[in-house]
């Protein structure tokens, strides 16, 4: 390979991995995208990940939760290894559970919970709603907005109006008979 080819390859690799989060190591893939290896660095939070991340290794850290939407900006993400972390398996882990369930359901049995006591040592994929705790507040938060509440109020008023109209019609037809 000519010297300019080697220099170009070196430049392309450096350019592709320049957004690599510390303390992780990154490797450019031949088919575009990045291999991001953050294993064993004692991370307690997710680092800022490059949008081109295709394979993400987060095993053997100190992660306990994943914020909702943490992987939404990673459209190429195919592989996610989050094993060997002290996961706190409650409602805050719902996003991670659903993400894995949609993409790599077999990984759910490899991810083990460290806490709370109801879920400790069990695989994330086998937890029941009782073990996860009450997640109802998270589900409500997505639809409780001022516009939605007005819509619900209008539907309730319309239903009440229809019920009154039906009652009035029944009373009128009985009076005519």
UniProtKB/Swiss-Prot annotation:
Keyword Membrane: yes
Residue intervals of the LRRCT domain: 85-137
Intracellular or extracellular location(s): Membrane
Signal peptide region: 1-16
Pfam family, one: LRR_8
Primary role: The GPIb-V-IX complex functions as the vWF receptor and mediates vWF-dependent platelet adhesion to blood vessels. The adhesion of platelets to injured vascular surfaces in the arterial circulation is a critical initiating event in hemostasis. GP-IX may provide for membrane insertion and orientation of GP-Ib.
Further remarks about this protein from its record: Platelet activation apparently involves disruption of the macromolecular complex of GP-Ib with the platelet glycoprotein IX (GP-IX) and dissociation of GP-Ib from the actin-binding protein.
Pathology linked to this chain's protein: Bernard-Soulier syndrome: A coagulation disorder characterized by a prolonged bleeding time, unusually large platelets, thrombocytopenia, and impaired prothrombin consumption.
Name of the molecule in the record: Platelet glycoprotein IX
Gene name of the encoded protein: GP9
């Amino acid at each position: 390979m000519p010297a300019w080819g080697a220099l170009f390859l070196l430049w392309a690799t450096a350019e592709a991995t320049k957004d690599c989060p510390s303390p992780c190591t990154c490797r450019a893939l031949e088919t575009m995208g990045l291999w991001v290896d953050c294993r064993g660095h004692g991370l307690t939070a997710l680092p800022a990940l490059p949008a081109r991340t295709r394979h993400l290794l987060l095993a053997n850290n100190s992660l306990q939760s994943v914020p909702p939407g943490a992987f939404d900006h990673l459209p190429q993400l195919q592989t996610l290894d989050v094993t060997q972390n002290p996961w706190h398996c409650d409602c805050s882990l719902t996003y991670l559970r659903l993400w894995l369930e949609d993409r790599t359901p077999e990984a759910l049995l490899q991810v083990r919970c460290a806490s709370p006591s109801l879920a400790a040592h069990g695989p994330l994929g086998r937890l029941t709603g009782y073990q996860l705790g009450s997640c109802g507040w998270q589900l409500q938060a997505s639809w409780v907005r001022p516009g939605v509440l007005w819509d619900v109020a209008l539907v309730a008023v319309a239903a009440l109006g229809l019920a009154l109209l039906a009652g009035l019609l029944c009373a009128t037809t009985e009076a005519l008979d």
